[in-house]
């Protein structure tokens, strides 16, 4: 494949494809090449396998409205989603929300407060899960009433969707549940924005099927969050190619900074992590085209009741957000 000359080389035979011409199809031994905005789409036909998709530069995404005042994607400013991993108490949630509200005002950013009312996917049965949906939503409602911040939390069962949508602005589907059709559809039917974590076991290309499930029930406010891919046992890596691939499906893409630092099960009954890589990878994702950034922020990570090895302090969040804003201002859009 020679993308520099926009053509294809197969064996000893070469077929050039000139930019600006009408779309054509070139068949070479069961291989089809369909030009699309100067870059070809490559599809394997003989064995029915997928070889990949090269999207044009300057690929714009549609925007998604989170509230009347906050929209992200397209030409809009980046969205930041931040808060403690799990609701530890009413007092702690409110304290962290106040801290993040001050950070929002200081940096003049669009920010959504996140915290989980139930961590149903904890490594161990002994791990803290949170207050549950009723108390958890009551606490999140109090956060919104005091700070005015929009809210995100996870749902784990389709029956929770309508109840959660009464309080939340974004319903999030956890990575391990991203292929659960009934769950994704129920969240989408609420009409709220839906963020789906791409499972560690999925390729970026497969995530389009998740978006299609939301669109099928009439909701075009569904987006994908990249949170790393399994790389052997107890390790995740972030493939930066995922961002242009996911954006090529037309929806904005969020990068989950802190969960991609995880070492799943790395501490036996708890997940380990490498938070020292949060800042460089956040910079890389900003350069690769991420439209939003998710981070779990805690005032005392070593004492956190969940993900203590990957949550970051507010001052670290400030540094990361400042980096992202500087990069976004310096780089042309992809």
Feature names for model-found ranges:
Residues 131-132, 149-157, 169-182, 193-204, ...:
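Catalytic beta/alpha-barrel core
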Residues 102, 128-151, 187-193, 244-251, ...:
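Alpha-helix-loop-beta-strand connector modules within alpha/beta enzyme cores
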Residues 126-134, 151, 170-177, 233-237, ...:
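Active-site-adjacent loop and "lid" segments of alpha/beta metabolic enzymes
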Residues 7-8, 16-21, 31-35, 40, ...:
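Short linear motifs in low-complexity or flexible loops
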Residues 80, 84-93, 112-133, 298-308:
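Glycine-rich, proline-tolerant flexible connector loops at the mouths of alpha/beta enzymes
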Residues 191-297:
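Catalytic alpha/beta core domains of metabolic enzymes, predominantly
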Residues 59-80, 332-334:
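N-terminal amphipathic alpha-helix/helix-capping segment at the start of soluble metabolic enzymes
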């Amino acid at each position: 494949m020679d993308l520099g000359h926009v053509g294809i080389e197969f064996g000893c035979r070469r077929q050039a494809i000139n930019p600006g011409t009408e779309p054509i199809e070139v068949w070479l031994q069961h291989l089809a090449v369909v030009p699309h905005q100067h870059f070809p789409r490559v599809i394997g036909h003989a064995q029915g396998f997928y070889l990949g998709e090269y999207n044009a530069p300057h690929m714009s995404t549609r925007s998604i409205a989170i509230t009347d005042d906050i929209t992200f994607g397209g030409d809009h400013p980046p969205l930041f989603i931040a808060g403690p991993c799990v609701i530890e108490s009413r007092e702690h949630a409110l304290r962290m929300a106040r801290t993040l509200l001050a950070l929002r005002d200081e940096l003049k950013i669009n920010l959504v407060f996140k915290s989980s009312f139930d961590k149903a996917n904890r490594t161990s049965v002994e791990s803290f899960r949170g207050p549950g949906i009723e108390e958890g939503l009551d606490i999140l409602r109090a956060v919104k009433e005091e700070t005015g911040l929009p809210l995100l939390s996870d749902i784990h069962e389709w029956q929770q969707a309508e109840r959660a949508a009464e309080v939340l602005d974004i319903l999030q589907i956890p990575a391990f549940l991203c292929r659960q059709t009934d769950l994704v559809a129920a969240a989408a039917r609420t009409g709220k924005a839906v963020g789906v974590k791409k499972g560690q076991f999925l390729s970026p290309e497969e995530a389009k099927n998740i978006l299609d499930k939301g669109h099928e029930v009439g909701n075009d406010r569904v987006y994908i969050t990249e949170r790393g891919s399994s790389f052997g046992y107890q390790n995740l890596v972030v493939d930066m190619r995922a961002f242009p691939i996911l954006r090529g499906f037309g929806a904005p893409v969020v990068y989950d900074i802190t969960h991609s630092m995880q070492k799943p099960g790395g501490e036996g009954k708890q997940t380990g992590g490498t938070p020292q890589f949060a800042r460089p990878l956040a910079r890389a994702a900003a350069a690769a085209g991420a439209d939003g950034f998710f981070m779990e922020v805690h005032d005392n990570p070593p004492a956190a009741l969940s993900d203590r090895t990957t949550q970051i302090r507010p001052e670290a969040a400030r540094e990361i957000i400042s980096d992202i804003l500087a990069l976004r201002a310096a780089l042309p859009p992809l």
